[in-house]
A protein has these predicted regions:
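Conserved loop->alpha-helix
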Residues: 1-206
């Protein structure tokens, strides 16, 4: 489990491609690798990956074919930086919201507005996922817990503060790029439950 508070952006220094998976080698800081062990879970752009090897602050992850297809890790190249968060430790402050590291879908960057007053990103997603995305609600964006701005039938707006831009890789994204999306699980459960109840009542009334 994760909090959506990105700890660092780290460079992908190599990608070894094999049948059915890619092995990512990510350069981390000594602070991030302190106490990290093989088998631990680390979020890379919001995707929960298992550590397979640690070598001189280089951390290795095996990324399965399905994960490559369903997330933007499939478009990641050597030299790119990914958002990194280690697993949640109970007893410490939680500043974001609980994320599982299981990406639901990808959003396409529709527009970027960077002015002296603001930095806004407009995202477009499949309309079925907009049932779970609400104005002022939370959503995981490349593993970063963010508040939703204006919403439409096909997407939503993000209003990013300088601190978020400094600590994450979101400033690197341009129109047409793909960003990993994890919706809030509690919101999904509530919406799905209400829809089932309403559908059942409608069926009984017919």
């Amino acid at each position: 489990m994760f909090t959506g508070i990105v700890q660092a952006t780290c460079e992908v220094v190599s990608i070894h491609k094999a049948a059915g998976l890619n092995t990512f080698e990510v350069a981390m800081t000594p602070k991030l690798t302190q106490g990290l062990v093989t088998g631990a879970s680390v979020a890379n752009n919001g995707v929960c990956l298992t550590v397979t090897k640690i070598l001189n602050d280089k951390v290795f992850f095996d990324v399965m074919e399905e994960t490559l297809a369903l997330t933007n890790l499939g478009n990641t190249s050597v030299g790119d930086h990914v958002n990194i968060e280690r697993s949640l430790t109970f007893g410490t402050e939680i500043g974001g919201h609980i994320l599982s590291g299981h990406v639901h879908t990808q959003a396409t960057v529709k527009a970027v507005s960077n002015t002296a007053e603001h930095y806004n990103i407009e995202l477009q997603v499949d309309s079925k996922w907009m049932n779970y995305i609400f104005y002022k609600g939370f959503v995981g964006i490349n593993g970063c817990s963010l508040t939703v701005g204006k919403v439409s039938d096909s997407g939503f707006m993000l209003h990013l503060i300088p601190e978020t831009l400094k600590l994450t890789n979101l400033s690197q994204y341009k129109v047409g790029d793909k960003i990993n999306i994890e919706i809030d699980s509690q919101t999904q459960v509530i919406v799905d439950t209400v829809e089932r109840i309403l559908a059942k009542k409608q069926l009984l009334n017919n």
